[in-house]
Curated annotation (Swiss-Prot):
Gene Ontology cellular component terms for the protein in this record: cytoplasm
InterPro entries hit by this protein: Rossmann-like_a/b/a_fold, Universal_stress_UspA, UspA
Gene3D superfamilies the record matches: HUPs
Main location: cytoplasm
Keywords: Cytoplasm
Name this polypeptide is given: Putative universal stress protein SERP1273
Organism expressing this protein natively: Staphylococcus epidermidis (strain ATCC 35984 / DSM 28319 / BCRC 17069 / CCUG 31568 / BM 3577 / RP62A)
Keyword Cytoplasm in annotation: yes
Family under the similarity heading: Belongs to the universal stress protein A family.
Domain of life: Bacteria
Locations listed in the record: Cytoplasm
Length: 166
């Protein structure tokens, strides 16, 4: 039987990512695996600003740090023994499969499905698709069709998002 020992889960604050995170916690527990929770702040967001908005960057960073701290606490409380977090800046499509997966020695990357609509996916593609195409290890993309309509995130709550909105 194949078992995974080093699982990387990508989170972005969306409901889909938290649903995938919950499943990653279950997989990590069943396999007694290391769980690395990653968030990549897409620095391309800032390229459209003529003047670099340091306040916006700081808000994004603080949101991500709080998000990762919350997810680590949930995973630890659920019984995952070895939990780590990573915060990176850059393109999630490149950093997750090409850098982070190798840096942490992941043998499984888990990700939620994209929140993009069909047109956006056609134009820019999804992070999940990029991970599948470029990962050096197995990838599990968690589908959200089975996510209950009343699913309420524990970490990426509306209150947390409101705290860091402009």
């Amino acid at each position: 039987m194949i078992s995974y020992k080093n699982i990387l889960i990508a989170v972005d604050g969306s409901h889909e990512a938290e649903w995938a995170f919950n499943k990653a916690v279950g997989v990590a527990k069943r396999n007694d695996a290391q769980l690395t929770i990653v968030n990549v702040i897409d620095s391309r967001t800032y390229s459209s600003y003529e003047v670099y908005d340091a306040q916006f960057t700081e808000k994004s960073k603080h949101f991500s740090e709080e998000l990762l701290k919350g997810y680590k606490e949930v995973a630890t409380n659920a019984g995952v023994k070895n939990v780590d977090t990573r915060l990176e800046f850059g393109s999630p499509k490149a950093i997750i499969p090409k850098k982070l997966a190798r840096d942490v020695g992941a043998d499984l990357i888990m990700s939620g499905t994209s929140g993009l609509n069909a047109v956006e996916r056609f134009i820019v593609g999804s992070v999940s698709e990029a991970i599948v195409r470029h990962a050096p290890c197995d990838v599990l993309v968690v589908r959200t069709e089975e996510m209950p309509e009343d699913f309420q995130p524990q970490v990426a709550t509306p209150q947390l998002r409101e705290k860091y909105q402009d």
